[in-house]
Amino acid sequence: VNGKKYIEIGDYCLIGRNSHITAHEMPQYNTPVKISIGDGCMFGPDMHITAVNSIRIGKNVRTGKSVLISDNSHGDPKDMALRNIAPNARPIYSKGAIVIGDNVWIGEKAAILAGVTIGEGAIIGANAVVTKNIPPYSIAAGIPARIIK
C-alpha cells in the first residue's frame, strides 16, 4: 500500500497476496486523491488499484485475480509530443474518477479504466476492459466491455 493517508479500507476486507494499492499525490489536481474500499470486499491475488483522482469501491465487491482498477495512465494518448518519451517518464493523466457499486463481481484479469461507474450488483466478465458506464444488475463482457445481459 502506497499513499496510506489517502486510502480507506473498510472492515472485514480480504486483499490477495502480491496486490498493490497506490494513491499518487498529484498537486496539479484541485482535489486530493482518494481510494475508498467498502466493508466486506474480497480481492483476488495480484490486484492492482492505482489512483491520482478518485476510486470508490462499494461494499461486498468481489474480484478474481489480476484485476486492474486505474483512473490514470502515463500521458494523454492524444498528445503526439509525448510519444517520444518513455511511458514511465510521462506525466500521469486521469480522465476521471471510478465508482464501483455495492455487490459487484469482477472476473479474473478484468481492467476497470478511468471515468466509469459500475452499478450495484453488476457482473464484469473475465478479461473484460471496462471503458464506459455499466448499469446496475447487468452483465458486461468483452474488449471493450459491452452489456450482454
List PLM regions with ranges.
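Flexible, glycine/small-residue-enriched loop-and-beta-strand segment within the central core
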Residues: 2-114, 143
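C-terminal/domain-terminus segments
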Residues: 111-145
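Short active-site-adjacent structural elements
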Residues: 148-149
